[in-house]
């Protein structure tokens, strides 16, 4: 017997098909890594026998001129997903301006896919006949923002959200909100998306929906439990600001009268790692070569002082994709923002110098503490001599 009170969903987002990373230093086409991740997502959808697949934007990386290869891959994976369950696609800020025409073409050859290009609700039928009302909030058209001042644009967005709340009440079986924007408080997690942000207060997400599927933020985030609101994150680590991000898709189970349940699907992306050094000396060169030799992903080197020794490391090491010189202040800022991620690198940045700076900023009697620290360092140096 078909259970219309149950809905199994696979939610994925931010594929960025066609992306090439580190174009200014060592361009790396990420196609094969993305395809492996997408293969895993499709396999999980098949294995879990999902009823509906939600794609919340930025499927393509180039907004103006996606490659033929990227469009071919997009069509291929959409077709594979449609064989598993009906698919609903919401556009994002990166998505190609011609996506609407592309969507018209795809929907002309299959009724198992829906492209929601506006703020108007859409009713779809899931795999087992469940009636699902989709409440879409696509990334707003830039022309709309330009026609309005900031206050008017904010009112425009909030009025759309209020209307979607009213529309959610008209659901038959399930109501799902789909949005591509930044939830207030998460702007720092936008990764490569940083810039002009559409920021929405989470309280404005219609509370009567059964699930809120979001896209745009590249790391997994459970925003709230009522309604369950999730960013699944992108499938791969596109740049080094995403080193510690959890990547993948989300499997969601909805049952009428019960709280929703979900499970992360890890896409197993290649790792990224930043190595920090005070200066590139012979010891640092050995450390870089040794680390890169055994590291399965891509590496960035950041150093503070120019020592005059900087051979063609990128020509020598295939997975070293970026070498940057940064000021002490820039490096300290990174360490403050992600202390757990980079704590093992502190010794390469002259730990005691950083600690002295910390004392100056945080301790009123820092002069006395600095004197004690210097005395300890002198004793250590004498014992090592």
From Swiss-Prot:
Task: Give the protein's cofactors.
Answer: Mn(2+)
> Which Gene3D superfamilies does this entry report, sorted A to Z?
3.60.21.10, 6.10.140.980, DNA double-strand break repair nuclease (3.30.160.210)
Query: Could you identify this protein by its name?
Result: DNA double-strand break repair protein Mre11
Kindly report, in one word, the top-level EC class recorded for this enzyme.
hydrolase
Q: Which organism is it from?
A: Thermotoga maritima (strain ATCC 43589 / DSM 3109 / JCM 10099 / NBRC 100826 / MSB8)
Q: Which residues bind Mn(2+) 1?
A: 14, 16, 58, 218
Summarizing the function annotation, the protein's role is:
Part of the Rad50/Mre11 complex, which is involved in the early steps of DNA double-strand break (DSB) repair. The complex may facilitate opening of the processed DNA ends to aid in the recruitment of HerA and NurA. Mre11 binds to DSB ends and has both double-stranded 3'-5' exonuclease activity and single-stranded endonuclease activity.
Tell me, how does this one assemble? Homodimer. Forms a heterotetramer composed of two Mre11 subunits and two Rad50 subunits. Homodimerization facilitates DNA binding.
